[in-house]
Amino acid sequence: MKLTCMMIVTVLFLTAWIFITADNSRNGIENLPRMRRHEMKNPKASKLNKRGCREGGEFCGTLYEERCCSGWCFFVCV
């Protein structure tokens, strides 16, 4: 019985702690589903697509490396 009460109190305390310490900025948890829907409608809006890529003639390394804007790499971006 004591263990059950301690577990309930612990869960309530941790739940309250999460709500107290949660980030309350504009891009918080409440806006996350809205942002994800926007990214699904417009995949180019995703932050992952905004990575820097290398232009033609720059050193890239190995074959077909994703760092080139064109997607083709043979030691330099093609």
Swiss-Prot record:
| Signal peptide, first to last residue | 1-22
Q: List the disulfide bonds.
A: 53-69, 60-73, 68-77
Q: Which domain of life is it from?
A: Eukaryota
- Tissue expression per record: Expressed by the venom duct.
Gene Ontology terms, MF aspect:
ion channel inhibitor activity; toxin activity
What's any one GO cellular component for it? extracellular region
Propeptide residues?
23-49
Q: What keywords does the record list, in alphabetical order?
A: Cleavage on pair of basic residues, Disulfide bond, Knottin, Secreted, Signal, Toxin
Q: Where found, per UniProt?
A: Secreted
Entry similarity comment: Belongs to the conotoxin O1 superfamily.
Q: What is known of its domains?
A: The presence of a 'disulfide through disulfide knot' structurally defines this protein as a knottin. The cysteine framework is VI/VII (C-C-CC-C-C).
Its name, as the record gives it, is Conotoxin 5
